[in-house]
């Protein structure tokens, strides 16, 4: 028979799980508030996304606008947004990675990108 019926260990596990859940929620809120940038064309096109990947701003230098070649501009926009999203994913790894390790890896946990 386990002294105390094993209750203290279960209570401790529940408290740890609640703390991890709170830490995860706080990290996700911080990611949603944090903005990261990406650029393309040597800075002619800049995109800003939140740490959770939401596009917030797009700045296009007038030098990048050629009415005869809108395809290149579109490519630069896509590249800038992709670069910003890659930076957001790196930030997610930085902020959420330690929490996922505390949960035994992020595998299968909704909201974790790894």
UniProtKB/Swiss-Prot annotation:
Stored InterPro entries: YbaB-like_sf, YbaB/EbfC
This protein's UniProt keywords: Cytoplasm, DNA-binding
Record GO cellular component, one term: bacterial nucleoid
Assembly with partners or alone: Homodimer.
Reported function: Binds to DNA and alters its conformation. May be involved in regulation of gene expression, nucleoid organization and DNA protection.
Recorded family membership: Belongs to the YbaB/EbfC family.
Name this protein carries in UniProt: Nucleoid-associated protein SGR_3378
Organism: Streptomyces griseus subsp. griseus (strain JCM 4626 / CBS 651.72 / NBRC 13350 / KCC S-0626 / ISP 5235)
Lineage: Bacteria, Bacillati, Actinomycetota, Actinomycetes, Kitasatosporales
